[in-house]
C-alpha cells in the first residue's frame, strides 16, 4: 500500500500484524518514551478488539535480545557509549563478569519475549525463518528502498513472505515502503516527521 499511516488509523479486523524491533522496544518501555509506549499499547489493544494477531519475527527476537545484552553491557561497564575494545578488555580481566553480563541480557530478553507470547493478541511462538529465498527477497527490497541497514530489509522480507496485513514500527526508514497488501503503521511522531518531509504538514 502506498504510504505509512499512524497506528490509530488502522482498521484491525481478523488481521495479522508483524511487529518490528523498534515497536517491541517501545512497547516494552525499553526506550523510555512513555508517549510512544502508550501508542504501541493502544495499537495492541485495537488488535485484541479486532480479533487480530500480532507476530514477532525471528529477526525481531534476535535484535531485541541484542538490545538487552547491550543494555546489560552498558550497566556492567558503567558507561553508555562503550566500545568493542571496552568489551574485549572486560572479557580479559574479568571473564566471570563478562559471562554474567551476557547471561543477564539474554535472560531479560527471554523473559520479555515469553511475557509477550503469553499475551493476547501475540502468537505464542516466533514467526518466520530466514531462508535463501528470504535473503534474495531482502536484497531486492534493499535495492528498492535503500534501507540504511540490511536488517531492515530482512524484517520487511519476512513480513512479505508471511503475507501479513500490517507492519508495525516506530522506525522512519519504513515510511516509504509500498508493497502490495501490506500496510506500514507508525507512531504519530514518526508519521508527523514523514508528512513534514513530504511537504504536507
Regions flagged by a language model, labelled:
Residues 1-60, 66-90, 192-195:
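Short, well-structured N-terminal submotif of metal-dependent ribonuclease cores
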Residues 30-33, 142-147:
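Short, flexible loop segments at the rims of nucleotide/cofactor-binding pockets, characterized by
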Residues 21, 58, 150-156:
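Conserved glycosyltransferase catalytic-site signature
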Residues 19, 56, 130, 169, ...:
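A conserved hydrophobic position in a structured secondary element of the catalytic/binding core
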Residues 60, 103-145:
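Acidic catalytic patch
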Residues 82-102, 106-109:
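Helix-adjacent hinge/juxtasegments
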Residues 1-12, 16, 143-145, 156-201:
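Acidic, PIN/NYN-like endoribonuclease modules and their adjacent C-terminal/linker elements
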Residues 62-63, 130-136, 189-196:
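A short acidic, often aromatic-flanked loop/helix-cap motif at beta-alpha or helix-coil junctions
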Amino acid at each position: 500500500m502506498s504510504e505509512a499511516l499512524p497506528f490509530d488509523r488502522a482498521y484491525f479486523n481478523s488481521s495479522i500484524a508483524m511487529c518490528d524491533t523498534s515497536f517491541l522496544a517501545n512497547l516494552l518501555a525499553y526506550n523510555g518514551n512513555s508517549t510512544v509506549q502508550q501508542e504501541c499499547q493502544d495499537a495492541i489493544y485495537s488488535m485484541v478488539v479486532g480479533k487480530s494477531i500480532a507476530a514477532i519475527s525471528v529477526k525481531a527476537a534476535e535484535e531485541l535480545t541484542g538490545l538487552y545484552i547491550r543494555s546489560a553491557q552498558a550497566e556492567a561497564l558503567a558507561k553508555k557509549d562503550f566500545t568493542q575494545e571496552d568489551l574485549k578488555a572486560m572479557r580479559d580481566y574479568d571473564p566471570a563478569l563478562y559471562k554474567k553480563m551476557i547471561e543477564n541480557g539474554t535472560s531479560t530478553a527471554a523473559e520479555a519475549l515469553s511475557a509477550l507470547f503469553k499475551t493476547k493478541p501475540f502468537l505464542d511462538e516466533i514467526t518466520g525463518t530466514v531462508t535463501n529465498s528470504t535473503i534474495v527477497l531482502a536484497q531486492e527490497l534493499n535495492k528498492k528502498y535503500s534501507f540504511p541497514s540490511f536488517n531492515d530489509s530482512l524484517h520487511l522480507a519476512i513480513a512479505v513472505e508471511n503475507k501479513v496485513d500490517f507492519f508495525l514500527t516506530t522506525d522512519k526508514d519504513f515510511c516509504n515502503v509500498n508493497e502490495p497488501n501490506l500496510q506500514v503503521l507508525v507512531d504519530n511522531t514518526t508519521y508527523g516527521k514523514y508528512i513534514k518531509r513530504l511537504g504536507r504538514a
